[in-house]
Amino acid sequence: MSNYQFTKPAGPFRLSELAKISGATLYEGKGETFTVSGLAKLSEATSNDLVMLHQKKYVKELKNTAARSCIIGPDYVKFAPDSMYLLVHPNPYKAFALIAQAFYPSEKSSSFIAPSAKIESTALIGSDCSIAHGAYVGNHARIGKRCKIGVNTYIGDGVTIGDNCIIEDNVSIRHAVIGSNVVVYPGARIGQDGFGFASDAEGHYKIPHAGGVIIGNDVEIGANTCIDRGSLGNTVIEDWCRLDNLVQIGHNVKIGKGSIIVAQVGIAGSTELGEHVTLAGQVGVIGHLKIGKGATVLTCSKVLRNVQPGDRVIGYPAISISDWQKQIRFLKTAIKSKNPLKS
């Protein structure tokens, strides 16, 4: 059962309501009026919790769970107990996400400005905004409607933030234009100087960064992620992108719509990602490369050359998965042979 110490769920909901919310189908029409009070893991659920099965390795837990209702894919219906009510969806994880949003809706912003917040006289603040203690909003900054600005957050001069944004605690934003429905988690740094120097035998000469950061709509920026501003042009994060915690985005990087950047990724300056690119955890990308639309770079890989649209690459240097698998098989064979230096 979920721990409600910090977040209490909405509801309860009837399964018929959850089917409508998620686009799922009630298996054989059973359980329309069954009431669900929360979401839980298979191993921790009570009878009134809703669980999910989206991987075969959890089938045993499904058979032993106390839950009486489950979000499930069509291929796994045969594994469910006969007495269980099933919400069937071709993408159970998506259905779970939509249902979870119903149980845990985003907090509505209330109109409140803390006495210790500092808002410059030329800043424009939209209606129904919440600005917490110690926050600062600079000259000519613009914040849209229904935004939440967290404790000790810094919004620099001229920054623009759209409607319905959540900027959490201890964030700093400079030289940036941010769209609507954006979430920035605690400790993120947006729009600071990029890492650019001209070097010779006498030292390193700082290159001023006169550009900015452009962030689209419906973007999430993880905790302690850093996005450097451009040197002359802008660093751009397009709509629907998701950046995990501890990500480093260098100056003038462009990240295409719907891309996913997982924790501890580093992208060096002026690299461009197409739409719907995925960079898995701890991927490193050198500067001035292009990663094509729909490409995937697997965990811990290091990208040293362009990646074509739709390619899936892995390794150091990153190569196609098929080539990487061939290399691994060859190495295993060579290690087992009496003379590993001979092919």
Curated annotation (Swiss-Prot):
The active site is at 251 (proton acceptor). One of its GO terms (biological process) is lipid A biosynthetic process. CDD domains: LbH_LpxD. Its EC number is 2.3.1.191. GO terms for molecular function: N-acyltransferase activity. It catalyses: a UDP-3-O-[(3R)-3-hydroxyacyl]-alpha-D-glucosamine + a (3R)-hydroxyacyl-[ACP] = a UDP-2-N,3-O-bis[(3R)-3-hydroxyacyl]-alpha-D-glucosamine + holo-[ACP] + H(+). GO terms for cellular component: membrane. Pathway: Bacterial outer membrane biogenesis; LPS lipid A biosynthesis. Catalyzes the N-acylation of UDP-3-O-acylglucosamine using 3-hydroxyacyl-ACP as the acyl donor. Is involved in the biosynthesis of lipid A, a phosphorylated glycolipid that anchors the lipopolysaccharide to the outer membrane of the cell. Homotrimer. Belongs to the transferase hexapeptide repeat family. LpxD subfamily. HAMAP family: LpxD. This is UDP-3-O-acylglucosamine N-acyltransferase 2. The gene is lpxD2.
